[in-house]
Every structure is written in structure tokens, then in C-alpha cells.
Amino acid sequence: MKTPRRRMRLAVFKALFQHEFRRDEDLEQILEEILDETYDKKAKEDARRYIRGIKENLPMIDNLISRYLEKWSLNRLSAVDRNVLRLATYELLFEKDIPIEATIDEAIEIAKRYGTENSGKFVNGILDRIAKEHAPKEKFEL
């Protein structure tokens, strides 16, 4: 059984992923297509906040992820890995009440489910480094 927060993260991931192939469409509108009546009010509000936050901070998020890609560029990553990293990096930096371990564990699960056999390990390595060097100090106490 998926928790409401896991379902919310999946909705955000799916919207980010679909936006890669539907660039001319608004990211928030893509999210609305995904959010149906099975999502509760809080999950919808959280998903919308995540999408707005990712959109507003995307250049900084992408720049930060790029710093940890050895011999790779962000554009060369699979759309799955790139968008899992964007979602989780946003959550690590801006969602103060989510423990670092929860963010990374959920990102690994999404990457393993939708990515390649190496996606989970790859995402884990990048996010672990981002968390250690950039997550707010209070997140280490959750």
C-alpha cells in the first residue's frame, strides 16, 4: 500500500517526467491531469507546492545536481534519473519536515521502479552527497 506522501511524490515525479516530452505545456497543468479524485486534499496541495518550488528553483537545483555528476552532464542522464534527482533535491533543500533518509529512500525506490538496474545506486550516491553538503542543519536532527 502506498502512503499518501509516496503517491504525492510519484505524481510530482510523473509530472516532471512528462514535461520532458511535453515542453510546450505548463508543468502545473500536467500535474493537474495526474491528480485525480483518489488524491486527498493535502496530497494535492503538497504536490502543487512541490511543483511550484521545483519550477521556481530549477536552475539552482540543476546546477547543484550537475556539480556531483562525474563525467556526465545533466542532459545526458535518463529522464527518469534527472527528474528523480530534481524532486529529491528540492525536498532535501526546501521541505524542512521530511527526514533526509526518507527523501533518499523514496527517491531510490522511484528510480529502481522506473529507471535502469543502476538507477537506484546512482541516485543514492548523488543525493547522499547533496544532503551531506547542502541540506539544512535542522534536517539532520529529524
Swiss-Prot record:
- Superkingdom assignment: Bacteria
Instruction: Output the Pfam families linked to this UniProt entry.
Output: NusB
Look up the record and give one Gene Ontology term from the biological process aspect: DNA-templated transcription termination
The cross-references to InterPro entries, in alphabetical order and at most eight, read:
NusB-like_sf, NusB_fam, NusB_RsmB_TIM44
A single MF term (Gene Ontology)? RNA binding
Q: GO CC annotation: what is one?
A: cytosol
Q: Which residues form a coiled coil?
A: none
Arranged from A to Z, the UniProt key words for this protein are:
RNA-binding, Transcription, Transcription antitermination, Transcription regulation
Q: Which HAMAP family match?
A: NusB (MF_00073)
In UniProt terms, what function does this protein have? Involved in transcription antitermination. Required for transcription of ribosomal RNA (rRNA) genes. Binds specifically to the boxA antiterminator sequence of the ribosomal RNA (rrn) operons.
Identify its protein family: Belongs to the NusB family.
> What protein is this chain from?
Transcription antitermination protein NusB
| Natural source organism | Thermotoga petrophila (strain ATCC BAA-488 / DSM 13995 / JCM 10881 / RKU-1)
What are the leading ranks of the lineage? Bacteria, Thermotogati, Thermotogota, Thermotogae, Thermotogales
